[in-house]
Amino acid sequence: MRLHKRPVYGLDIETDTTIDGLDPAVAPVITVALSNASFDEVFTGREDEILCAVDDRLATMEPGVIATWNGAAFDLPFLAERAALHGIFLGLRLRYDRSIHLEHPPLAGHPGAYRARWHDHGHIDAYRLYRGDVGPALRVSCALKSIARLVGLAPIEVDRTKIHELSHEALHAYAASDARLARVLTERRWATAARFVDRIAPQGDAAVA
């Protein structure tokens, strides 16, 4: 199957912001959202059940490309570390890449950003795609919501420091929106995005610091 015919699956996570939602040592994952052109799915509940359910779902989906927004430095290593704390094996493979430049400090306990694949799915961090050209050319922030508004999309916005205060329905909608935006922004630039898909072997190292 040629790369351009593979489906794109947006992925986004939300973490418990009660203490520090940016530290995987203390903050559990409370929601994971997946988005494809034909569905939006949101996983909630106990963290161990979320991790297993997402992994099982990805294992059964047609091989494609997982699109994240800053997932190389946040979402994917966060999920990997939380799974390790539970003793859960995921089909998520990470490889640290020191060549990926970070604008902000790395995730707590990690050296930087990673290349990834999950089961038979490749990975693209769409944030790095847009930061590489759109950001410098237009001198705009490459935050997900900023880019979405720039191209005419309507993101759902909340106070990210108070994710734990959102209602069940609001959390579902917010997570699904972010996963959908990552997917759509990748699909809209697929001719270029295809070249940004991570290239690592399926049996690469599971890199959790």
Indicate where each model-derived feature is located.
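Generic, well-ordered alpha-helical scaffold segments in large soluble proteins
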Residues: 57, 61, 78, 82, ...
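Common nucleic-acid-contacting/processivity interface regions adjacent to the catalytic cores
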Residues: 161-209
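Intrinsically disordered or highly flexible coil/loop and linker segments, enriched in small
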Residues: 63, 67, 136, 156-157, ...
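Conserved RNase H-like, two-metal-ion catalytic cores of nucleic-acid enzymes
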Residues: 1-67
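C-terminal or mid-to-C-terminal helical accessory/interaction module adjacent to the motor/catalytic core
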Residues: 133-134, 139-171
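Conserved DEDDh/DEDDy metal-dependent 3′-5′ exonuclease domain
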Residues: 41-139
